[in-house]
Amino acid sequence: MSEFSQTALFPSLPRTARGTAVVLGNTPAGDKIQYCNGTSVYTVPVGSLTDTEIYTEHSHQTTVAKTSPSGYYCASGDVHGNVRIWDTTQTTHILKTTIPVFSGPVKDISWDSESKRIAAVGEGRERFGHVFLFDTGTSNGNLTGQARAMNSVDFKPSRPFRIISGSDDNTVAIFEGPPFKFKSTFGEHTKFVHSVRYNPDGSLFASTGGDGTIVLYNGVDGTKTGVFEDDSLKNVAHSGSVFGLTWSPDGTKIASASADKTIKIWNVATLKVEKTIPVGTRIEDQQLGIIWTKQALVSISANGFINFVNPELGSIDQVRYGHNKAITALSSSADGKTLFSADAEGHINSWDISTGISNRVFPDVHATMITGIKTTSKGDLFTVSWDDHLKVVPAGGSGVDSSKAVANKLSSQPLGLAVSADGDIAVAACYKHIAIYSHGKLTEVPISYNSSCVALSNDKQFVAVGGQDSKVHVYKLSGASVSEVKTIVHPAEITSVAFSNNGAFLVATDQSRKVIPYSVANNFELAHTNSWTFHTAKVACVSWSPDNVRLATGSLDNSVIVWNMNKPSDHPIIIKGAHAMSSVNSVIWLNETTIVSAGQDSNIKFWNVPF
């Protein structure tokens, strides 16, 4: 029997940047979409989250990924101009080759219909595009003729082959081949061209731009055949930049995504809009990308939300929420059915653990990085953030009601949070204070050191504060006052502390990779003399199992390690690369055998760790 297994994954959302198109890929069957965040490529089923695959072999930030029409390989690009071609049929995703295309970010990739050639465009120094054979990397032509960065590229899916591209010089170019050479450019747009796409049979292609227009062309020679116009607007398709377009599988319709916060469905025969789908009213509701697979129409909002669009009804059937910035804290509800996660931008998500369905807590509780989040048996949510506030979000409806959050201003920046199970006591470790919140009243106690983390015993008797002075300061808690009863010296700055659920032990971790448990009853002396230093980098977080027997730690070394207090000399369970290429920022136990981890990669993973 394996020591551990991953049982679930709640994946990151796509990385987004305002005013920049998000290019999506999909599998030949149309049952999965592909997007990028960090150094990873995500292949996500449109029907569920359970079978998400993550490719993590890029050394630099990824930008775009496209699977070949054969379905056997994927080509993914990064900000340094590298295109990696890797196997999609095996979970190990064996690398076939890496092609250095140019010296800047790859913005779009396209395969030919034979899965032999790849065109990649972007923002290089010497060139903005390249076409090559996928198996050898040999050049198969020259994509020149546009004066500025190329944003979009597409292969004609039928012979005679063509390549089209859209550029920041406001033009659309067409190339003949193979080998491919420049044929002509078309200046139908007055601003940047964001997207160009062929229809499924290659008879037509369309382009979109920052001028809000969508232009239709003949697929072979690029002759302009029409312009899509919304009668409610003046000679344009959208009132904002159009960042993406996609053809329906039957080629009779086009869907467009725009900065005007709408998605529009167009009839290709009439060049008229059939459905206008408003997504929202906020800046983050701008639509940056869209793809119409054989099974779903999917768009990406500026905040990374994944929208599943019903083109027949002109509505959004489902929205997938999540994070696309580092997850900094986790907490689960008392009944173990709901998970709360917080990130570096101040967002909080609630997750149904059994299904993976998520919701964003609106309005946002904080505007900056959340450093601590805790739930109570009453369903309330306590949070602290770099905005120097401790907030209490009351239970409401099916989750929490952030519109009724109670804010408490702190005198210095909070770095950690501990809350009693009933919510009667909350303690925040601040840069220059210990903040104690009890029954609606906030008391701040000055300290002479800089704190880094905090823990509260379940009986509310002790508070342990980890310091940047390489010491654990243990206090006796009496009402809203504390008195220091023990100082424990470590070899390096304390990174996390936690009391066991029965109050028998206190564990502390530090930057020197050490995990050290102490006996509370024995005046916080060492609980054992074994050296728990299996991590290879700073330990970032720690959590006790409900039965007080095991504890889990997460580290900058990408791993999660499970330690056993009953067998301190045994080799621990090491989940190496639990979050590949990413620090593990938070770990919690759901039950005696299930750990949840979250990392810098914005992913949440569930691990079964049997005894």
Swiss-Prot record:
PROSITE patterns: WD_REPEATS_1, WD_REPEATS_2, WD_REPEATS_REGION. WD repeats lie at residues 57-96, 145-185, 188-227, 237-276, 322-361, 446-485, 489-528, 534-573, 579-610. It holds the Pfam family WD40. One of its GO terms (biological process) is negative regulation of actin filament polymerization. GO terms for molecular function: actin binding; actin filament binding. InterPro entries: G-protein_beta_WD-40_rep, WD40/YVTN_repeat-like_dom_sf, WD40_repeat_CS, WD40_repeat_dom_sf, WD40_rpt. It is found in: Cytoplasm, Cytoskeleton. One of its GO terms (cellular component) is cortical actin cytoskeleton. Gene3D superfamilies: YVTN repeat-like/Quinoprotein amine dehydrogenase. CDD domains: WD40 (cd00200). SUPFAM superfamilies: WD40 repeat-like. Keywords: Actin-binding, Cytoplasm, Cytoskeleton, Repeat, WD repeat. Belongs to the WD repeat AIP1 family. Induces disassembly of actin filaments in conjunction with ADF/cofilin family proteins. Regulator of actin organization in myofibrils. This is Actin-interacting protein 1. It comes from Caenorhabditis elegans.
